[in-house]
């Protein structure tokens, strides 16, 4: 977008792009800039936050095990019959380490017990709870969609956490 105007004559903001097209914003749920409708990649991502909220006196001393996510999302305004979003959880063992890594020596085994990072879960309109397996001191959260006709609003998700070890 190269130029914008908030016009009182029209109800939506108007922008011009580099292909000499006028784009009307905040109208509909898809990208209609061309004749071929495209989905809008919409997301919101948190910064890192401590998993063990009750660990106020010894902040960061305990690992937390997130075993359930209670999503709070609505799909008001969606134009498809089964809208969905993806919720991704990014665990961090220590500040400054990469997401999903640990500073412990790996267990030697013929099986791969590692969980992918991020852990992604599909959430639909009537998803009441999502069972997870996530361990760490901190985590970040991302909610996104990339499908045509999907509009969503994120509320306050809740997580069920158990204390899971100490450093």
Go through each PLM region and give its residues:
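Beta-sheet repeat architectures centered on beta-propellers
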Residues: 1-167
């Amino acid at each position: 977008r190269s130029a914008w105007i908030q016009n009182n004559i029209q109800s939506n903001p108007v922008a011009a792009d580099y292909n000499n097209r006028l784009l009307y914003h905040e109208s509909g749920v898809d990208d209609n800039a061309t004749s071929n409708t495209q989905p809008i990649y919409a997301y919101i991502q948190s910064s890192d936050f401590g998993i063990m909220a009750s660990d106020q006196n010894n902040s960061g001393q305990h690992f937390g095990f997130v075993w359930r996510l209670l999503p709070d999302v609505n799909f008001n305004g969606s134009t498809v019959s089964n809208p969905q979003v993806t919720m991704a959880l990014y665990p961090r063992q220590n500040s400054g380490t990469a997401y999903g890594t640990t500073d412990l020596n790996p267990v030697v085994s013929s099986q791969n017990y590692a969980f992918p990072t991020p852990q992604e879960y599909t959430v639909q309109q009537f998803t009441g709870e999502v069972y997870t397996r996530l361990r760490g001191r901190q985590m970040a959260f991302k909610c996104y969609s990339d499908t045509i006709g999907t509009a969503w609003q994120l509320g306050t998700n809740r997580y069920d956490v158990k204390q899971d070890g100490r450093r």
